[in-house]
Amino acid sequence: MSSRGRTDCLKRQPKIDCDHFLCVFNALVAKMSNPVDFNLYLITDRHQVPAGYTLFSVIEAALRGGVKAIQLREKDLSTDELLPLAQELRTLTRQHGARLLINDHVDVALAVKADGVHLGGHSRPTETVRRQVGTEMLIGVSTHSQDETLTAFEQGADFVTFGPVYTTPSKAAYGAPQGLSALAEACRKSPLPVFALGGITSERAAEARAAGAYGVAVISAIIGSAAPETAAKSFST
């Protein structure tokens, strides 16, 4: 081959995106050092707490019932309002050997030394957050399509939620329910653990796992229950 031919060949070589490669590499390192070691993921919503309970007491009961991961998701609270609540839950989850993830507020997660952060569709890019928190924190990402689950992996997430699987008022803004077939396809194609989200009850949890879900993410079935400890236990039977 002539020198010109070799030069043209070199010019045609694909350009390596070093930042992208580093994000994927860091994601793989994070998965080895900080695995997703829970399959019931409780997401908070203090507006659904029944009479006679506080958000703290509901979560405490859920932890007694076997929940091993809490996502603090109170979208209408400011950072100053969220921080003391996160500090209380950090102490509580440590007492029960459970994980605490903070929705969106990376600053709060770092301040209370949470186990991770959970990012939604309007959050900062996952790869940006991964660079900020390093490999010690878990990053969960909300997804609503198979393409989004793959993007989450490429950008450094550790796991994803996928939904809504069933009809649920709390996720009505995300459109019609995806159904079990879409969940199964997302689980089949995703390199990450997938948590089924949206309308999940203890009965439906079995269907979601049969479709390939690594675990389930729950809000009202436990947070809104008059017996949250019993409700939490029902997901492990």
Mark where each language-model region is.
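As written
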Residues: 156, 211-214
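Glycine/threonine-rich flexible loop motifs
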Residues: 170-172
